[in-house]
Curated annotation (Swiss-Prot):
Pfam families: Oxidored_q3 (PF00499). Its EC number is 7.1.1.-. It is found in: Plastid, Chloroplast thylakoid membrane. It comes from Dioscorea elephantipes. The lineage of its organism: Eukaryota, Viridiplantae, Streptophyta, Embryophyta, Tracheophyta. It is a multi-pass membrane protein. It is an enzyme of class 7 (translocase). The keyword Nucleotide-binding does not apply. Its main location: plastid. GO terms for cellular component: chloroplast thylakoid membrane. Gene3D superfamilies: NADH-ubiquinone/plastoquinone oxidoreductase chain 6, subunit NuoJ (1.20.120.1200). NDH shuttles electrons from NAD(P)H:plastoquinone, via FMN and iron-sulfur (Fe-S) centers, to quinones in the photosynthetic chain and possibly in a chloroplast respiratory chain. The immediate electron acceptor for the enzyme in this species is believed to be plastoquinone. Couples the redox reaction to proton translocation, and thus conserves the redox energy in a proton gradient. This is NAD(P)H-quinone oxidoreductase subunit 6, chloroplastic. Belongs to the complex I subunit 6 family.
């Protein structure tokens, strides 16, 4: 979107706060259906971030794949889970909860320390005069493909493994 600087900044701050609230809704809501809808809202807000950074193809792919397919699959799997199986009232932490929280906290802090040190040379940024800065004249879709198969190959594969594990877990929970 070609917006003025202050309007763009206000939009990014608003989308970021809505994204954080939606993420908290995913984690903190007790009803699984509300949590799944909150996840859909988070994925929709991420696509709005892509639109605000002039990445329309990635935004459309985000809407179609994640909001349209993955979130519907998660809601479908959640609807098959009976409430009596998972409504135990024990609020005690187990060893798995502790291990999971340690792993997630370490990933969070490693991301916080890694992101500022990353060179973002391949990303197309827009300047204040709304001119797109590009090194070569290939389209955005080609740049995405080139970067996914060269620079971002390992993160792309790790994300696909995480998605595969989450889908296997959802199917396993739905069958039980």
């Amino acid at each position: 979107m070609d917006l003025l600087g202050p309007i763009h900044d206000i939009l990014v701050i608003f989308l970021g706060s809505v994204l954080i609230l939606g993420g908290l809704g995913v984690v903190l809501l007790n009803n699984l259906i509300y949590s799944a809808f909150s996840l859909g809202w988070v994925l929709f807000c991420i696509s709005l971030f892509y639109i605000s950074s002039n990445s329309y193809f990635v935004a459309a792919a985000q809407l179609l794949i994640y909001v349209g397919a993955i979130n519907v699959l998660i809601i479908f799997a959640v609807m098959f889970i009976s409430g009596s199986e998972y409504s135990n009232d024990s609020h005690l932490w187990t060893v798995g909860d502790g291990v999971t929280s340690v792993v997630c906290t370490s990933i969070f802090f490693s991301l916080i320390t890694t992101i500022p040190d990353t060179s973002w040379y391949g990303i197309i940024w827009t300047t204040r005069s709304n001119q797109i800065i590009e090194q070569d004249l290939i389209s955005n879709v080609q740049q995405i493909g080139i970067h996914l198969s060269t620079n971002f190959y390992l993160p792309f594969e790790l994300i696909s493994i995480i998605l595969l594990i989450s889908l296997i877990g959802a199917i396993t929970m739905a069958r039980q």
